[in-house]
UniProtKB/Swiss-Prot annotation:
GO molecular function, one term: carboxylic acid transmembrane transporter activity
NCBIfam families, sorted: tpt (TIGR00817)
Stated name of the protein: Triose phosphate/phosphate translocator TPT, chloroplastic
Transmembrane domains' residue ranges: 113-133, 146-166, 180-200, 230-250, 257-276, 289-309, 321-341, 360-380, 383-403
Tissue expression summary: Expressed in stems and leaves.
GO biological process assignments: monocarboxylic acid transport; transmembrane transport
Amino acid sequence: MPALGTLSGGAAGVAGLLRLRRATPSPAVATPFPAAAAARCAAAAAAVVPDGGQLVWGRQLRPALLLPAAGGLLQPPTSPSSSQAGRRQALRPPAAATSGEAKPAGFLEKYPALITGFFFFMWYFLNVIFNILNKKIYNYFPYPYFVSVIHLLVGVVYCLVSWTVGLPKRAPINSTLLKLLFPVALCHALGHVTSNVSFATVAVSFAHTIKALEPFFNAAATQFVLGQQVPLPLWLSLAPVVLGVSMASLTELSFNWTGFINAMISNISFTYRSIYSKKAMTDMDSTNVYAYISIIALIVCIPPAVIIEGPQLLQHGFNDAIAKVGLTKFVSDLFFVGLFYHLYNQVATNTLERVAPLTHAVGNVLKRVFVIGFSIIVFGNRITTQTGIGTCIAIAGVAIYSYIKAKIEEEKRAKSA
């Protein structure tokens, strides 16, 4: 009997919660059991809850289902319409409430491969456009030191405007960080200027073929400067690179020693930039680091440009360029080539952050193929059969080297994890 009394008291409590009218307690009814008394008190206190029916789809409703989601006090309904709304809210399945709270997946989360492909496309597109426009400028304005300054100047202005609007937020810098970044920026400036001297004096395709030797200098610096052992497969993969560049250089129609030597200096400079970058690792994001490096490199590049090319520019350089293409085109070409230079470097960094090193290495090789191919088509450069074969061998060697190096790095990370 006690069990039966408890059950009947609980049922009375549920019935009281489901009544629309206020229940009138009878003093003559005895409540011998504490649980039944408590249930009747709860029913009297909450008798204003809208009537939702005791059975829904053949199931007994629980009192907790009818309690409001927010707040601990029950309020009486103000109108029949609000009563109906309350009943519909009470009878709504729990899944309907939780489904509304789930945030729909954004476009970036739903299609990551598509976004990564877009980054690769922009990287290639900006790089090809930069190289073509850069060479067109040198065809009527052969002053690579000044053009190098313009590249960096436009990039610095872009960074300053981005910092002003907070995209990205400028990271603070101190004297210690400046000392770490200065060697990196110095090598960046030297490599950038010598690359442009090479682009101005030889064909773009040949300059990029010479720059394919950069992995060889990286391996040599790692082995003999940093004292880190380079695996034998990496050294062997560099043999076709050296062979291909040698074959292409022997029969290149646009070959001259100024372009060749400056391209080699550029390779060495960018190699040391990589070495100093490893020593200057900071917690600053790559966008801010590249911005500070560009600012320092700009300051470094201005004096040589003024000393070496300043007098010629003032005498006839600017006037000759304006006479050939006009002031508007001359200024717009310089602005856009600087903008494309900064953007393609920034997109290359962002692409590296999205993909594995192996994917980025393969993409970098394909980028060089695109640049060489499009430059030959756009400028109609004549190349000999031996130069074409040598270029293909060099690019294939770089691809093999990049693949082996990326696999070795992945194995090292897997072992350390």
